[in-house]
Amino acid sequence: MLDVMARPGNLMGECPQMTTEVVPEPGLPAQAQAVAQPQEVAAPLTSAAIFLVMVIQPGADSCAAVRDLFSDLAGLLRAVGFRDPDAKLSCVVGIGSQAWDRLAGPARPAGLHVFPEIEAGSRHAVSTPGDILLHIRAARFDLCFELATHIMTRLSRAVSPVDEVHGFRYFDDRDLIGFVDGTENPTGRRAVEATIIGPEDPEFAGGSYVIVQKYLHDVSGWNALPTEEQERIVGRTKLSDIELDDAVKPTSAHNALTTITENGEEVQIVRDNMPFGTVSRGDFGTYFIGYARSPRPIEQMLTNMFVGRPPGNYDRLLDFSTAMTGTLFFVPSMPLLESLAEPAEEDPAAGEAGADSPGAGQAAPVATPSDGSLGIGSLRGVTQHE
């Protein structure tokens, strides 16, 4: 039995809404010609990262503090990053569905909604609160930590932290269950095309979507499995990181269920997953973070994993991994993010029908086909780019 629902991120205080204007700039990918520079969602993997998820406190002052951070973020990055430019310090900002209503007004990105909860048997992809995501990364952890400290000092009275994870590179980009992570990531222009919104949503072209989940692993149980069984669950060899041949790879393998096709071609996303852990507590985890130009492919990958394709043929990794969080964010282009710093005059009508109205920020119900599945199986002919 599949139960799919959405939960609100947090209660909203009233904030002045604003209007936005996207300014064109040259030199961007074909699908993003209408906007200026995207945030660094397609940047290469780094050796250190901090993931901060927070909710905005009620009230206009809290919104104002968050907007001020948006306008000053580039300066903060320069102030911290100058110590080692080669470390490539960056910070991607994502905005949750309900926070968008508070910060940006009625115009919404087409794919922005509350992350849909997925439950099937004992497997549960939870939906958890989150108004703002900060994905801070660099080749040096000290730079990440310094930037996070400056940001949280600025926002101390305006936000409440929901989750903070410190990620690190583990050997040759392996996760804590011993397999290389991110092998199939696109690079260069292919990464940009996979992550940056184009003409399908022209008002928000240059933006992106990101889904984050914090997984904890039963490492003892996993390590008790023979290596060959682990490889069949993942779909790749453990030592050499070679994909198993289709003749021997189960249809429930992780990399089989997370392969999504559209019109005969694989739909790609960019994963920037990082291991994390606390040895004394026995916490060993993977922070999943996936960027895409539409949230639909990632949501369907997760449905394949938790429900199965077909239903019941689920990802056996979930017998050893538990999702502790799950949140969807929109990642504005750089000029759109900076423009959010200046609220427009509040529209009384918008305030009456805004975030505090019944159903605001809720995801639409997921239509279930008559066979009981979510229609995920083969996605050929299904448009992923909204």
What are these regions (language model features)?
Residues D3-E14:
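Short, positively charged and aromatic/hydrophobic N-terminal segments
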Residues C15-I376, G381-H385:
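Long, histidine/aromatic-enriched segments associated with O2/redox biology
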